[in-house]
Amino acid sequence: MSNQPYDFIAIGLGPFNLSLACLSEPLEGVKSLFLEQRSQFDWHPGMMLEGVTLQTPFMSDLVTLADPTSKYSFLNYAKLNNRLYPFYIRESFFLLRKEYNLYCQWVCSQLSNVSFEQSVTKVEFCQQSECYTVTCKTPNGEQHYVTRHLVLGTGPAPYIPDCAVQSNSNNVLHSSDFCHRLDELKAAKRVTVVGAEIG
């Protein structure tokens, strides 16, 4: 455990916290840490359909609207990874979901304040120090971190109503598992879609 507390620790690494990691890393005097339980960034892997785009233009990447000069912009990623001209030639301001995921993975590889395989098991607040102690389970054992502030970005959990689960759980799936069960769905004689979300 470090003696000096972090200014903030963020738990979970989706696009929101990844954006915060990009914007906070270059700030002098701000000590931050981003903890993620998975082994790498993987944005909605069960929903990576071929040819599907984001619903917002590329300028709403992780940083551009807050800091257009950031080295973590999508355009910088595209230039450094020989993707700028293919993106331009595609003639769409809307990123493919797969390209966005690759962009986010690239950003993670550039950041020094991101730590994977850190499953947070406990958070305790100490009145005396006015700090939180964050306990994580890692492949190398238990880790403890101290921070003045917490940022939670754990994202929503897939929800299937009890009545659907009880009816026949083998035939019910959440859209987040769609690509993982695509062959099974293609073989099905009937498919019913219930509910929808925009976003």
Language model: regions and residue ranges:
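N-terminal Rossmann-like FAD-binding beta1-loop-alpha1 element of flavoenzymes
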Residues: 3-33, 191-199
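Core beta-strand elements of the Rossmann-like FAD/NAD(P) dinucleotide-binding domain
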Residues: 4-6, 138-149, 186-187
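Short hydrophobic core segments
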Residues: 9-11, 120, 134, 144-158, ...
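Glycine-rich active-site loop/strand segments that organize a redox cofactor
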Residues: 35-99
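Helical element adjacent to the flavin cofactor pocket in flavoenzyme catalytic cores
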Residues: 97-115, 120, 153-158
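A conserved short coil-to-beta-strand element within the FAD-binding core of flavoproteins
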Residues: 116-132
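Conserved SAM/SAH-binding loop
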Residues: 117-121, 138-139, 177-179
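Glycine-rich dinucleotide-binding loop and its adjacent helix/turn
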Residues: 154-199
